[in-house]
Amino acid sequence: MSSNPQHLSGNEIRTRFLDFYAQRGHQILASASLVPEDPTVLLTIAGMLPFKPIFLGQRTPEFKRATTSQKCIRTNDIENVGRTKRHQTFFEMLGNFSFGDYFKEQAIAWGWEISTEVFGLPKERLVVSVFEEDDEAYVIWRDQIGVTEARIKRMGADDNFWVSGPTGPCGPCSEIYYDFHPERGDENIDLEDDTRFIEFYNLVFMQYNRDASGNLTPLQNKNIDTGMGLERITQILQQVPNNYETDLIFPIIETAAKIAGIDYHSSDETTKVSLKVIGDHVRSVVHMIADEIRASNVGRGYVLRRLIRRVVRHGRLIGISGEFINQVAERAIALSESAYPNVRKRETVIKAELEREEANFLKTLDRGEKLLEEIIQQVKKQGQTIISGESAFTLYDTYGFPLELTQEIAEENNLTVDEDDFNVEMQKQVERAKAAHETIDLTVQGSLDKLAEHIHATEFIGYSQATATAKVEVLLVDGVVQEEAEAGTEVQIVLDKTPFYAESGGQIGDRGYISGDGIVVQVEDVKKESDFFVHFGRIERGTLRVGDSVTAQIDRAGRRRAQANHTATHLLQAALKTIVDGGISQAGSLVSFDRLRFDFNSPRGLTAEEIQQVEEQINTWIAEAHSAKIEVLPLAEAKARGAVAMFGEKYGDEVRVIDFPGVSMELCGGTHVSNTAEIGVFKIISEAGVASGVRRIEAVSGLAVLDYLNVRDKVVKDLSDRFKVKPEELPERITTLQNELRTTEKQLETLKGQLAIAKSDSLLQTADTLGDHKIIVAQLEGVDPESLKSAAERLLQKIGNGAVVLGSVPEADKVSLVAAFSPEVNKKGLQAGKFIGAIAKICGGGGGGRPNLAQAGGRDASKLPTALEQAQSELKSALG
C-alpha cells in the first residue's frame, strides 16, 4: 500500500461515505435544517442532534440504520477561526447510526473498512483510541482488526466517554487518528500533538444509562452514533496543510483574494487568517439564509448578522473597501449546490439578504470611522495618548469596528489603545450575554427528562388564579434530585399545578411565595422546561419535602404591572403598524415588572413626530377602555382572522389569541389586562437602533410613568438652578453655550493652522531640486498632526512636482509625521503611505494612508532627526 492516501474531492468523499453505508442497510437521510427541532439549541451543532429524541427514547425510529451528511454550525470559539488548522463555524459531519441494531464489533469493523479500503488510508498511518476501561473495544481493535498495541491508546473519560448530560444515555467512544509523520515511530505517541495527528472518525457506543447518583446501568437497546468530519478527512486525502486549503473551502478563499488583488500563498499570516475567516463564514451564512434564517439582533438571527459583519470586516483588513460578499457567496453556492440544491433554489433570497446586510454594515463602519475621529480629537485635546478600552469596545460592539483597525488608525495619530481595558469590557459583555440568554440549567433539564415518565406535566392555572394548593412533585438542589431541603437552601421546585407564569414570549417569570406547614420559600423566577414549570427560589423557613402540600401564591402587584406592560407591547406594535409602517414586525421583546422593551425590524429610526403620534395613539386606546377577548383557536383559523404571529416562532396546532377588537390581535401565551384602561398611561422613554435594520423602543406604563417623570423633573430643576434660568429657557441657554464653544474651537484651530503655515512657508527656500522634482524634508516645532498635514499639502501645492516630508513633536514623547507626494513621484514607484510608515518605524511607530498623502506617528521623539535624515536620503536616491 502506498504511504500516502488516494486523492479524492470533497464531493466524492461525501458520496462514497453515504454509498458505503447504504450498501450495508443504512437509509440515506438528507441533512436536517440548521434550525433544530430541539428548542434548547440555537443551531444544529452535531450530526447526531436530529436523532437526539431517538437516543433519549422519546421517539421510535423509522429505520434501524441511517447515514447522513449533516451540515452544522458552531460559533462558541469563533475567534479561533482561521487561526488553527481545523477550527470552523460551518462543517459537515458524515455519520452512520444504529438504533438498537448492530453495535461495537460491527461499527469498528466498518469504520476500519471505509477508512482503509474505501478511502485508501494506509494502515500504518492510523492510530486508534479507546476509553481506558473499554477492554471490549481494545480487544476488537487488536485481535479482529489487527492494530498493534503500540497504536491503540487508552484515554480517560474527558476524551473518550460520551455523555448526553449529567444523566441519561452515555457510553465509551473510540476514535481513529491519521498520522502525518509515521517516521517518528510508535514510541511515546501523543495524540494531543496536532502537528502529527488528526482525529477524523469518532465511534460512540451508547450502552449505558447514568442515574442522578452517577451509577451506570446497561441499556436494553444499545445505539451507535458516529461522526467523520468531512473537512478533516478531505484535508487528509488531499494532503493539504489545513482544512481551509481543501477544495471545499479554498475556491472561496481564492475568489476573495482575487477581489483584494492579492495571492493567498504569498500573503503574510495575518492576511491568510482574514481570507480563511471569509472562506469559512461565507459558507455559514449561505446555508443559514438558505435554511430561512434572517439577520436580526436576537437568537440565530444575531449569529447570522455577526458572521456577515465579520466577513465584511475581514474584507476591509485585506484591502477590500466596497461591496464584495455576493461574489464570494456565488462561489460558495456553486461549491455546495450538488449536495445541497436548496442553496441554488434560494440564491435570490440569499444574495438579497447579504447585499442588504453588507450595505448597512458598510454605512455603520463609516459612522464608526467618524466616531473614532471624534474620539481621537477628544483624546488629543485632553493632552492624552491613550484611547480607552471602553471607547474602543463601544466602536467594536456598537459599530462592529475591529480592534485591529482602531489600533492601526490610533497609531497613525500617535496614539495607542488600552487593550487590557478593552479585554475587560469584552469579558463584561460575555457575562452580560450569558446572563441575558441564560436558559434553564442543563442539569435540571437532565433530571426532569429522567423523571418525566413518573410525573405529570405541570398544570398552569395562572390565567385565572393567583393562588393554588399544590403538591411538591420534584425538588432539586443544584440540579440534583433531593427528597428534602432545609432553610437557607437554593432550590428548584416542580409542583403538580401552579399559578406562577414561567418566563416565555419575552415576559419574565412571576415572583412570589410557596408556603406550607412551617415552610416559606421565596420564589425569584420561574422557567419552563418541556412540560414542567420550574420554580427557582430560596427556602426562608422550615424543611421542604417531596410530597408536601403547599400554597403557591404569586406577587399580585408584580403580575399586574407585568400584564399591563405586556398588553402595552401589543398596543405598541399595533400603533407602529398603523402610524409608521404596516410592514413592521417584532424582532424581540422584554416584559418586566417595571418597564417594557420592544425590538422591531425597520430600516430607519422614528422621527420625534412619529414617536409622539405612537404614544398618543396608545394612550387613546387606553382611554377608550377596550376589553380583551381571549380565545384558543386552530392555528390556521387564527391566522385567517389576521392574528399577528412572531416571525420564526414555532406554534402548535392550537394557539391562544389575545384580541382587543379593532385595535390588536396577536398569538400570545402571556398574561394580559382584561381591559386597556387598566394600563393607566403609557410613555416612550427611548427609541434607538440596536443593530442594522433593528430598532428598539423602551417604555413604561402605569405608576412607573410617574416615577420616570419625577426623575426628569429633578434633572430639569438641577439644570435650571445651575444655569440660573427658568426651565423653559434651558434649550436656548444650552444652544448659546454650544455655539460659543464651537466658535472658540474654530478660532483655536485657525490660529494653529496660521502658525503652521507661517513656519512652513519659510521652508520653500530650503527645497532641494532633483531633476524635475523638488523635495522638502524638515521638522516643525510643536505643530499638531492636523496642522502638520495642512502645511505639507500647502508646500506641495507651492512646489508643484515633488515630495514633502514633515515631522513634529507636538508633545512629549509623541512624534507626528506626514508625507505628501505629487503624481509624478508616485509614478517613480513611491507611495506616501508605505514610505511614511517605514520612516515612522525608526521612531518606534507606524502609520499609512493614500499614495499621495499619508500620516504616521511614533513614540521616540529623540529619533525624529534620524528618521527625517533617512527620509531625505531615500527620496534623493529614488528621485535623483
Swiss-Prot record:
Belongs to the class-II aminoacyl-tRNA synthetase family. CDD domains: AlaRS_core (cd00673). The lineage of its organism: Bacteria, Bacillati, Cyanobacteriota, Cyanophyceae, Nostocales. This is Alanine--tRNA ligase. PANTHER family: ALANINE--TRNA LIGASE, CYTOPLASMIC, ALANYL-TRNA SYNTHETASE. Pfam families: DHHA1, tRNA-synt_2c, tRNA_SAD. It is found in: Cytoplasm. It comes from the Bacteria. The gene is alaS. It comes from Trichormus variabilis (strain ATCC 29413 / PCC 7937) (Anabaena variabilis).
